[in-house]
């Protein structure tokens, strides 16, 4: 399943809110779920627990759900997440190096996602939604989330089931 196919399925369960509230809800959801993802990594790093791959897939799926909610207002985001251009924009060599310090990298990606979500919330009112910068921020957020999924070896299509 690609992201475009996933969005309408995911949004069947999404509460209907005015545009600005909906975008804020999705951005806050992304930040919260990235926090839960970081918590899983923390448990492995600090307490030596094995990474629970099933839970990791669930958390990435939750992040994908909230990202799907942004697609309603930034349709280009779905195209971006399904594009070869996104996959080519990821520096896989850097990700391999980053994998050596996965805790730090996941934390940096989570912080990046949180900052981008906060930036996106500034565009939440209808007057600013058409701003080209809003679409760029949405794409950057999608890239941070995709890179995190790649780093954790989670196939987004698997997480979107």
Task: Name these PLM-found stretches.
Residues 1-161:
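Flexible "arm" and connector segments at domain edges
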């Amino acid at each position: 399943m690609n992201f475009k196919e996933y969005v309408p399925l995911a949004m069947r369960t999404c509460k209907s809110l005015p545009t600005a509230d909906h975008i804020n809800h999705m951005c806050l959801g992304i930040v919260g779920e990235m926090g839960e993802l970081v918590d899983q990594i923390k448990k492995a790093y600090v307490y030596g627990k094995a990474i629970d791959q099933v839970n990791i897939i669930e958390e990435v799926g939750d992040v994908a759900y909230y990202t799907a909610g942004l697609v309603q207002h930034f349709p280009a985001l779905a195209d971006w997440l399904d594009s070869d251009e996104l996959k080519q924009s990821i520096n896989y060599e850097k990700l391999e190096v980053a994998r050596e310090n996965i805790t730090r990298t996941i934390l940096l990606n989570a912080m990046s996602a949180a900052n981008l979500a906060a930036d996106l919330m500034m565009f939440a009112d209808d007057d600013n939604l058409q701003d080209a910068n809003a679409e760029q921020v949405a794409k950057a957020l999608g890239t941070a989330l995709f890179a995190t999924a790649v780093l954790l070896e989670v196939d987004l299509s698997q997480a979107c089931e």
